Regions:
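Conserved, mostly hydrophobic/aromatic
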Residues: 19, 32, 76, 107, ...
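Generic detector of well-ordered alpha-helical packing
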Residues: 21, 26, 78-80, 108, ...
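N-terminal amphipathic alpha-helix/helix-capping segment at the start of soluble metabolic enzymes
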Residues: 28-29, 33-46, 260
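Metal-dependent enolase-superfamily TIM-barrel catalytic cores that perform enediolate-based chemistry
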Residues: 38-151
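Shared catalytic-loop signature of beta/alpha-barrel
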Residues: 122, 128, 139-156, 161-259
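C-terminal extensions of enzymes
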Residues: 241-283
């Protein structure tokens, strides 16, 4: 079924990932095994959680920073490039001064123009984040490679790399030193695993990204990382806990002391609340 879906239509990676996730959930329940076990051993039982700081109103994000710190979260990713450069610098300064307990990552989400990409990336590199993600447009491999050569901080590719085909090209052109791996972006767990394995073999670091998902959407990514030792930089499966008003899982998405807890129950490990889905559905 998946082989047919992969080639029946170009792109549509989220739909393909949803189909594969449903089939793997079914297979796991038939075999009485969690999805991660279908791929081998569990490499991580608890995955470090990163929460993104992305509100144009930084006063609201200051409250979020206090909350997640109290919850035991120790990784944050600052979304940058959507307002002024000074706004980005101000927030970096604030986080470094008032939240030294938090490890900082930076994500431009393609927010910089090519001509400003290097200088602004280097400015934020002075705050020594763990990595800086996708400063310029996805297709601009030339500028990504230029920044990668001169940036003292790990440069991560996101929108530039969707699946195995992209990561091979990205490695050959040396556009980064790491990649954000997403089940929905890659077109499923299997293709995401392959992308991570190719990247790691080339010496790249891998991070577990997501696509603004509910708890149900997070779960395939959890099983991906649990079964994939190549993904070492944690995950960003925070929406179900910190942003979704009402999640659609029957129980809370499993987060404990700043870590996502990998489920061991059959299939994806949690079931959707059908009554909630029905109530939230458009009719």
């Amino acid at each position: 079924i998946i082989s047919t879906a992969l080639y029946a239509i170009a792109h549509a990676t989220e739909a393909k990932a949803a189909l594969e996730s449903a089939l793997l959930d079914l297979e796991g329940k038939i075999l009485n095994q969690p999805v991660w076990a279908l791929f081998g051993q569990k490499s991580q039982a608890r995955i470090p959680l990163s929460v993104s700081i992305a509100n144009p109103d930084f006063e609201e994000d200051k409250q979020l920073l206090q909350k997640i710190s109290a919850d035991g979260v120790r990784l944050i990713k600052l979304k940058t490039g959507f307002k002024s450069h000074q706004f980005d610098i101000m927030r970096c300064e604030y986080i470094r001064k008032y939240h030294p307990e938090l490890s900082l990552r930076v994500d431009f989400n393609q927010g910089l123009e090519a001509e400003e990409g290097l200088s602004r990336t280097l400015d934020l590199a002075t705050f020594e984040p763990d990595f800086i993600e996708q400063p310029v447009r996805a297709h601009d491999y030339e500028t990504m490679a230029k920044i990668n050569r001169q940036c003292p901080v790990l440069l991560l590719a996101d929108e530039s790399v969707f699946g195995p085909e992209d990561v091979k090209k990205a490695i050959s052109q040396n556009i980064a030193g790491g990649v954000s791996i997403k089940v929905m972006k890659s077109g499923g767990i299997k293709r995401a695993r392959k992308t991570a394995q190719i990247a790691a073999k080339a010496g790249w670091s891998c991070y577990g990204g997501d696509m603004h998902e509910t708890g149900l959407g997070h779960l395939p990514g959890v099983h991906l990382i649990a079964s994939c030792p190549e993904i070492t930089l944690g995950c960003e499966f925070y929406h179900a806990r910190y942003y979704v008003i009402e999640d659609i899982l029957s129980t809370k998405f499993p987060i404990d002391e700043g870590h996502v807890v990998v489920p061991d129950s059959p299939g994806l490990g949690f079931s959707p609340d059908i009554e909630k889905i029905d109530a939230l559905s458009l009719k």
